[in-house]
Regions:
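Bacterial extracytoplasmic/cell-wall-associated proteins, especially those involved in peptidoglycan
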Residues: 4-110
Length: 110
């Protein structure tokens, strides 16, 4: 379980560490939503990058909660993407946006 927590914390940090605690929570919330539907962390994590980041204490606390006592997703969005992805892929603005992070309830591609 500890290894899984560290892995998830690395991903949270890598995906949104530059956006601070709010951004990290939003990415973790997409993981919570995906876990609600799959109940399998391998299925959840295959959609994320950022595995090589050193996790912060906050990312680790989010990961610990996701593994030991997952919350019901607040945003109900399985997709998270950046402004850069939005521009290069010509995707729409997300249902929820924070700084350069977009959360979307449906696949943003065509």
């Amino acid at each position: 379980m500890k290894q899984l927590i560290v892995l998830i914390a690395c991903v949270i940090q890598g995906e949104a560490g530059g956006l601070g605690e709010i951004g990290m929570f939003m990415v973790a919330d997409t993981m919570a939503y995906r876990y609600e539907t799959s109940q399998n962390w391998d299925d959840v994590l295959k959609y994320y990058y950022g595995y090589n980041s050193e996790p912060s204490d906050f990312a680790t606390s989010l990961a610990t909660r996701l593994v030991t006592d997952p919350w019901k997703s607040f945003f109900q969005c399985p997709f998270a993407y950046s402004d850069q992805d939005r521009y290069t892929q010509k995707w729409p603005v997300g249902n929820y946006t924070y700084k350069s992070l977009h959360l979307k309830q449906s696949w943003p591609g065509k």
